[in-house]
Amino acid sequence: MSPREIEVSEPREVGITELVLRDAHQSLMATRMAMEDMVGACADIDAAGYWSVECWGGATYDSCIRFLNEDPWERLRTFRKLMPNSRLQMLLRGQNLLGYRHYNDEVVDRFVDKSAENGMDVFRVFDAMNDPRNMAHAMAAVKKAGKHAQGTICYTISPVHTVEGYVKLAGQLLDMGADSIALKDMAALLKPQPAYDIIKAIKDTYGQKTQINLHCHSTTGVTEVSLMKAIEAGVDVVDTAISSMSLGPGHNPTESVAEMLEGTGYTTNLDYDRLHKIRDHFKAIRPKYKKFESKTLVDTSIFKSQIPGGMLSNMESQLRAQGAEDKMDEVMAEVPRVRKAAGFPPLVTPSSQIVGTQAVFNVMMGEYKRMTGEFADIMLGYYGASPADRDPKVVKLAEEQSGKKPITQRPADLLPPEWEKQSKEAATLKGFNGTDEDVLTYALFPQVAPVFFEHRAEGPHSVALTDAQLKAEAEGDEKSLAVAGPVTYNVNVGGTVREVTVQQA
């Protein structure tokens, strides 16, 4: 064969899910980004060539009504209008929806239907316990609505979590009708070799056409290599965030991943000019949110502690409130013991907060002398099945302290109908607009929704710094810099003027 006859295969396209409109600002600035700071980038995001755009779900719904006085449903409708060519994607906590407890199946159905009706395309459905029973109904509702159901595996490390176990869970999700599988690494624990092994094993077991999406955070500094190894193993789509909203406890930069693949036999086919415009847009608005910025850069200690950053800050605030910050090391050591007693659940919302709070209680009050209601529920099965057996001694204590009995069935099977009750209660609230969307807002956040409904007409309340405030801060910094060096004074001492130079400390 002559050189001219050598076949050159086309690079394999790797899809990209852009996270800047949801998880990027949730991870970097406590989910405080206002809609007004996102709309200007939507046209470029829509035309950049992403596989999907994550823009809703997770903590954004709560943040909209609690902090920003924004209607989350209006946010979704606006994204749909501004990005007509994009697959819009959300993160859904299975039977928990976007709240912090399990909801009756009818509420789940209504929520999924309304999300689809308002413009959502891809539903990434996960469960904090990796219990497929807690994902089944939500996924069925997504399929019924004619949308993309993405079954999710929460990645964690423990003596009971293995490649084989993750492959088995992937099979269960596929049997439920999952259109794709997401491997979700929320704490940046996924090292390169396990990334390769898990992706390859799922592909080898269920076929190369099985779509797998990979979500990694960047907190530990190793996961960009993990993305590369996953791509080599056949992963179809990876999650990234535009560079001006990336790294730290956030995610790997979109442009870096795209550039990394050039010349490797893989490509993203993204429009670099559009990426640079998106980058510049968020680079300009990010300083407005600096008071909410996470201070975390790279932290490899997570590999040992298994404690994600959000969980760490939550425990610190609890200890600070009790004047016991000196107990932090003891609490850090207690977390793995509490997690083991609970059967090694992945540390993701809400299990991370529940395990962390119980660790604080154990250190402050003695081991399981006082158990939170939520931790007792985990021990008794009310959050679902744990990956491993729970400590029977702690289960017994949970029974005694809570007055409840252990369960083995799907927790939502025990819930009474609640839609009619929620509808009637919501209808009595000032500012309620009569829609199912408002009923859902009340059902998910019954303490916050009444205040939001009453003040919704006032419009969004951005918590970002204004341009005037940023300018004033910059001018203040310049004045500080002006006196940062040695300062010379003329001092009159007994009628004699002396020149004194003072060096700034």
From Swiss-Prot:
Residues bound to Co(2+): 23, 184, 215, 217
The biological process GO terms on file are:
gluconeogenesis
Cystine links in this protein are none
Q: Where does substrate bind?
A: 22-26, 59, 184
Q: Which domain of life is it from?
A: Bacteria
Q: What does UniProt say on post-translational modification here?
A: Lys-184 is carboxylated in the free enzyme and helps to coordinate the cobalt ion. Lys-184 is partially carboxylated in the complex with pyruvate, but is not carboxylated in the oxaloacetate-bound form.
Q: What class of enzyme is it?
A: transferase
Q: Which cofactor does it need?
A: Co(2+)
Keyword tRNA processing tagged? no
Q: Which reaction does it catalyse?
A: (S)-methylmalonyl-CoA + pyruvate = propanoyl-CoA + oxaloacetate
Q: How is the cofactor bound?
A: Binds 1 Co(2+) ion per subunit.
GO molecular function list: metal ion binding; methylmalonyl-CoA carboxytransferase activity; pyruvate carboxylase activity
Tell me the ranges covered by the Pyruvate carboxyltransferase domain, including all copies: 14-276
Question: Is Transferase among this UniProt entry's keywords?
Answer: yes
Assigned EC number: 2.1.3.1
GO annotation, cellular component aspect: cytoplasm
Alphabetical list of Pfam families matching this protein? HMGL-like (PF00682), PYC_OADA (PF02436)
Chain's role: The 5S subunit specifically catalyzes the transfer of the carboxyl group from biotin of the 1.3S subunit to pyruvate to form oxaloacetate and 1.3S biotin.
How would you summarize the oligomeric state and partners of this protein?
A: Homodimer. Transcarboxylase is composed of three subunits: 1.3S, 5S, and 12S. The core of the enzyme is composed of six 12S subunits. On each side of the core there are three pairs of 5S subunits. Each 5S dimer is attached to the core by two 1.3S subunits. Thus the total number of chains is 30 (6 + 12 + 12).
Spell out the protein name for this chain. Answer: Methylmalonyl-CoA carboxyltransferase 5S subunit
Source taxonomy = Bacteria, Bacillati, Actinomycetota, Actinomycetes, Propionibacteriales
